[in-house]
Amino acid sequence: GLVFYRYSGAQWDMLGMMFFNRELIVETWPILLGGLENTLLIFICSAVLSVTIAPIIAIIRTLNNPIFNCAIDAFVDVFRSLPILVLVIFIYYALPFLEINSTPFAAGVCGLFLSALAFMIEYFRAGIESVSRGHVEAARSLGLGVIQTMRFVILPLAIRVVLPPLTGHLVGLLKATA
């Protein structure tokens, strides 16, 4: 440490002035708050969209329809394997060739939404499939319909399984917006 301090060529006496300069902080504070606002808006938009649409697609995925399953599997495989940055750049620069113009904000939200949606579909599908058949059969024997069984029995039990990975992914999504 001392060798680095002595021979690095850094101006260590300027360190305090560079990092704790009140005038510099006052100048850059509005810029930082604007970036924080954009980060939170992109995160909230993409998180709300993906958390509301993922359970619906996961329920469709568990219906065992071969056409839907093939389409959903292809979507999940493609968008889980693409890096978020590549996806956002592709949306922003490739869609104008299809005469679909978007703002950088919309491209960011769309890219993060598609990436998060692919992961969250799998989280919700795994949560739904983790509910034991005994619970489903008990609900059906009590006279609950398919939709009522899904709403009152399967989804509340699946949320317990889904919540930890979903929370972790939302934290990662917030970090990815920056």
Each language-model region and where it sits:
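Transmembrane alpha-helices and adjacent helix-loop boundaries
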Residues: 1-178
